[in-house]
Amino acid sequence: MAGKDRKTIEKNYPGAEVDEGGRFKPLPPADDDAKLLVCEYPSLGVIRLDYDYPPALGDIDHPGSFYYDVFYRVVPGLTFGMCQKGEMPDEIKQRFIDAIKWLDAQGVAGITSDCGFFMNFQDLARTVTDKPVFMSSLCQLPAVVCAYAAHEHIALFTANGESLKPMRDLIKKECGVDPEESRFIIVGCQDVPGFEAVANGDRVDVDSVMPHIVRLAKETVAKYADTAKPIRAILFECTELPPYSDAVRAATRLPVFDAITSCNSFLAALMDNPRFGVNNWHLSWDGSQTDYRYGDNLSADLKAKLVNAEHAENVAAAERKLAKDRQKPKPATGTGTAFDA
């Protein structure tokens, strides 16, 4: 519960004891037969690239995408290029390790990242913590593969169709799956109108991009619908694709796995199931996210090492422009929806 003041905690959780750091102390057993202590609700830890951008709702960097609390930690100096190559200078590697340790100290139940290329550091991260580490939505791939017949296709959507090729050996090593097997259909979104904003680090106009992503998904599924190898599932590799997951599910009637479902599945394994068994062994989340802005929870020295801090004003300007554009009246375009694309 780090980041919440004592009064808020005492109001929402009467009787709970809180230490000086604002964290819950385990409550004593209700009686002599009680074996379980009440603990905090599970929360998620997210390692961030040193890259400030305006995340859309559904993006892993938007705390509103989750039904549990999220703690973010940016790694100063860790750029997208380093992440893509899977190489960090020793100084930045230590900052990455320190970031994992910091999230661990917040009591998170699992740790992920805001870029699929963090799969390059999956092995390093899991040696630093005993919490489950799922740096990419591709961590779900073994379960998805297991769920469907060998002759059925699985579509893998990425920001760029070429991006998975250099990661082939890594994915085989970490996931036990070869992305170049014939059962996988690799679909790049680099030509989707408006989605180039992802590569530019700008705010994506989700409403404008939505019908194009849906159309791409429907066309991809339709291409194999009447064959002996239909597409049975879709996995979004890019962390900025989940905002479109629900629309694609509705349009294709197929399961869509993404970075959010990856986080949900791991955290659900540490959540109370109220339907049966022992109940109320962890406290309920009050629905308020821990406040976070880019660079928060870093020391002054580390903040000075951020390479993308100057991007913040550009982000703010883009947000203001988007808000202004949305206020302009739009010409009538018919009654179609994203699902009709």
Curated annotation (Swiss-Prot):
Gene Ontology molecular function: any one: dimethylpropiothetin dethiomethylase activity
EC number: 4.4.1.3
Coiled coil: none
Biased composition (Basic and acidic residues): 1-10, 319-328
Keywords: Lyase
Catalytic activity of the protein: S,S-dimethyl-beta-propiothetin = acrylate + dimethyl sulfide + H(+)
Region of interest (Disordered), residue spans: 1-24, 319-341
Function: Mediates cleavage of dimethylsulfoniopropionate (DMSP) into dimethyl sulfide (DMS) and acrylate. DMS is the principal form by which sulfur is transported from oceans to the atmosphere and is a key component of the ocean sulfur cycle.
Similarity comment: family membership: Belongs to the aspartate/glutamate racemases family. ALMA1 subfamily.
Assembly: Homotetramer.
Protein known as: Dimethylsulfoniopropionate lyase 7
Organism of derivation: Emiliania huxleyi (strain CCMP1516)
